[in-house]
Amino acid sequence: MKVLFTTDITEEPFTLTEIKEALKITGSAADDELERMITDARIYIEKAIDTSVTARTIQVTSLEKMEEWELPYGPTADLALTYGTDWEGALTYIYTYTGGVTTCPPEITRLITDYIKYKYDIDDEAIALPKSIKSQIQLLTRQP
C-alpha cells in the first residue's frame, strides 16, 4: 500500500506559543527545536492512532480492495475509487479522499502536547513511553 498526501495540512493543530505555555518555557532559545517537535509529535501521534488531526487530501494505492474504515489517516470523506495497474500489470485500487476532521479534537491536541512534554523532558531516547501516553493512544486509535 502506498500513501500519498496530495494536499497536506497547512498549519499545526496548535502554535509555538501554546506549546511554550504548556511547557512553561519563556524566551526564544528553544523555539526552533520546539517547532520541529510540534511537527514530529503530530506525525508520530497520527501514525499511532491512524487518524489525521486536520483535513487533507490523501491518495492510497493498493493491490487489495479496501473498505472505507481500512484506509489510513481517517476518518474519510469524499471517497473516490479509480483503478490502475502497477509496473507488472496487476490491477491496483486508487482511493482518493479527504482524511481527518476540520478541527483537531481537544483530546488529540492534549495527547500531542503530552507527547511533546515527554520528548522535551527526556535526555535518553531509550526511555519507554509513559503508560499515560500509551493509554491515551490506545483509547484514541481508530477502530473498525
What are these regions (language model features)?
Residues 1-144:
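Divalent metal-cofactor coordination and adjacent catalytic microenvironments
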